[in-house]
UniProtKB/Swiss-Prot annotation:
A motif (Gly-cisPro motif, important for rejection of L-amino acids) lies at residues 137-138. It comes from the Bacteria. It comes from Bacillus cereus (strain B4264). It catalyses: glycyl-tRNA(Ala) + H2O = tRNA(Ala) + glycine + H(+); a D-aminoacyl-tRNA + H2O = a tRNA + a D-alpha-amino acid + H(+). InterPro entries: Daa-tRNA_deacyls_DTD, DTD-like_sf. This is D-aminoacyl-tRNA deacylase.
Length: 146
């Protein structure tokens, strides 16, 4: 499992011009799932993200988690995170999980994030989405389970 995490001042996702998920501040997650991922990977990533200390304290040090600052999470599925661009000029997506499997694991992942005590908004799995955010910092990390 691969997640691109962005600390966000605000974020939203729209499908067909209609906002389907939005947060006032917190973390925007682009979530990629490969065919080798399991529920164990999803739980590991959910716990890691909830507890990563990437928000500043009073002295400007990254000492607070999204839980500490009472932020929210916008989670967006993105199979293209498993695009392999090493050969040719068109990405190969063979490492991305099949949609049925990926959707089930993506839903499980979001529930695991909620179990950490976070409010989670989502995009629409498999849809073309317009994502808008103000990246805070910018702080952008890649979190992987393997």
């Amino acid at each position: 499992m691969r997640v691109v995490l962005q600390r966000s001042k605000k974020a939203s996702v729209a499908v067909d011009g209609e906002i389907v998920g939005q947060i006032p501040f917190g973390l925007t997650l682009l979530v990629g799932i490969t065919h080798e991922d399991t529920e164990k990977d999803a739980t590991y990533i959910a716990e890691k993200i909830a507890n990563l200390r990437i928000f500043e304290d009073e002295s400007g040090k990254m000492n607070h988690s999204v839980l500490d600052v009472e932020g929210q999470v916008l989670s967006i599925s993105q199979f293209t995170l498993y695009g392999d661009c090493r050969k040719g000029r068109r990405p190969n997506f063979m490492d991305a999980a099949k949609p049925d499997y990926a959707e089930r694991l993506y839903d499980f992942f979001n529930e695991e994030v909620r179990k950490q005590g976070l409010h989670v908004e989502t995009g629409k799995f498999g849809a073309m989405m317009d994502v808008s955010l103000i990246n805070d910092g910018p702080v952008t990390l890649i979190v992987e389970s393997k």
